[in-house]
């Protein structure tokens, strides 16, 4: 979503 693109979310895994 747009909010995800705004902030660099760390790759969980």
UniProtKB/Swiss-Prot annotation:
Q: Which UniProt keywords apply?
A: Amidation, Amphibian defense peptide, Secreted
Main location, first listed in the record: secreted
Q: What is this protein called?
A: Peroniin-1.1b
GO cellular component, as recorded: extracellular region
Modified residue Glycine amide is at which positions?
Answer: 13
- Family stated for the protein in its record: Belongs to the frog skin active peptide (FSAP) family. Peroniin subfamily.
What is an annotated GO biological process for this record, any one?
defense response
Task: Name the tissues where it is expressed.
Answer: Expressed by the skin dorsal glands.
Q: Which domain of life is it from?
A: Eukaryota
| Localization terms from the record | Secreted
KW Secreted (keyword) present:
yes
